[in-house]
Amino acid sequence: LNTVLHILFVIMSVVFIYPILLTLAISFTDEATLANYGYSIWPQKWSLDGYRFALSGNGIVNAYKVTIAASVCGTLLSVFIMLLYAYPLSRKDFKHRTGFTFYAYFTTLFSGGLVPWYIVCTKMLHLNNTFWALFVPSLVGSFNILILRTFIKGTIPFEIIESAKIDGSSEFGIFFKMIIPLSKAGIATIGLFQLLGYWNDYYLPMMLITNKNLFNLQYYLQSIFLDMEALTSGQYGSAAMASAVNIPKETT
């Protein structure tokens, strides 16, 4: 049985790893060779033109800096805020926990809509073209709050909290000295969800950012592809078409 499971996991690993290796191989393949012979896991002719084009200028470096900063700040803030909300919901002695739980759950069923969301972000919070726009609108997720609440309720006995209160610990003392250290597994899980979400986010910069210095990595790469599409489609005239001939469109 173990042998069968090992073989199954090896096959699944190959299935998941192969597209990554193929993408990496394509990035090192010469553009003309790719057009003539198609995709291959081993390049017939190696080339770094795609990397040279992507790294030309400081745009990609700045996009990495913005993405890393937004991902780290957003993850730390969102996990802390959601933990502050989730912890009271797990307490038996918090009489309003049912109402606050329903309030969090209700937002998963109905959305306020795109237009009200945009008005709040731009007219009330003034987030447009600011660094905060890359993570503040996504700081709190109701689903993550419910996960944290369930984790705390299921892993930390309420008797421990009562013992700490009897010993004279304050609510913030219990939260920082007991709840956070004992919830590391749940925090790590939600933190990973948030980190991946911020790193791969394309929606927020598309809606709120027009300043190229604030483009994150995903939106910057998309802007590169759109520029290449525009050049190769001839939208900018014959001079631009001439300069677009050598653009490594497929390998970038």
Give names to the regions the model predicted:
Residues 1-252:
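A hydrophobic, multi-pass inner-membrane permease signature
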